[in-house]
Amino acid sequence: PRVRRQRQMCIRDSKFILFHDGEKVKVARGVNSLQTTTQDKGDAWKKIKMVEVMDMIQTDIRTTAQDSYIGKYANSYDNKCLLVTAIKGYLVGLEQSGILQAGSSSVGIDLAHQEAYLQSVGTDTSKMSQQEIKEANTADKVFLEASIKILDAIEDISLNITI
């Protein structure tokens, strides 16, 4: 597409395009082919950079868990906390590298899933505190949850100048 409007229409349609700006060839926008978003997969899933970061985080955490935790530690609350601390440290490193928004990362035991598991194996959780649910024996299962905010690339700049 030769004109800006045509490029914008292609981007809107999730087309990856290159263009020449008069000096060099550039990527119009780092989008992938995803067109339909869902509640779970919003607009961030349309961006190549965002998906690459999500894939990297998933791969790094999975590899660390497999290499350093699975089968090597007893599934105690203290050892779950060690795993949580390791993941949090990794996420803070990504914040410091400018990949994640500073101060946005959290990780901890997924209380809802842990409680559901306990109930599924016959444990009455109705009188348990949140801390007791966190510390409860979950056999060989670890239920964690995390929240992050991935920083996108600068793509649109608006500058209003008043004279």
Range-by-range predicted roles:
Residues 1-11:
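Single conserved hydrophobic/aromatic residue that forms the stacking wall/gate
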Residues 15-163:
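Structured, hydrophobic secondary-structure cores that serve as assembly/anchoring elements
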